[in-house]
Amino acid sequence: VMGKTKNTLLTWLKGLPKRWFVDGLSSMALGLFASLLIGTIISQLGQINALSFLSKFGDIAKNKYVVGAAISIAIAYGMHCKPLVVFSCAAVGAFGYDCGGPVGAYIAALFAAEAGNVISGKTRIDILLVPFTTILIGCLIGSFIGSPISQFMTWLGDVINSATKL
């Protein structure tokens, strides 16, 4: 039994780089596109007098909580998580984005999706435990890494701005 567990763990660890960086980042891009980018386009269309009703649609689509949720849901979906994990990631992404922007949502979603997947389908009370675990782990990760990530991204932006002025 120990050998099988060790092999399963090694297989899982070997798959993490593709799962987190290829699948996770490409899915994150889809979530950003489906919310922030499209929301911005809709908002711009709302600047036309005849289409002013679109402004509110765009504003909602590009709201930080909606963008965070879209990022996190897209990541969980791209990682082939079970439905309860995917849907629970909405709260994780909103929280992660609030704490650490898009990178905060990304990292919180990765940990939440993995944690939710570990227990999904293993209990009789999945309907309670899967969302609880997914949201709890994701929000804890988001709260720990959010502020440092936000500070780092601000610093990186300042460095890039300074470099472009040289």
PLM segments and residue spans:
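Signature of multi-pass transmembrane helix bundles
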Residues: 2-166
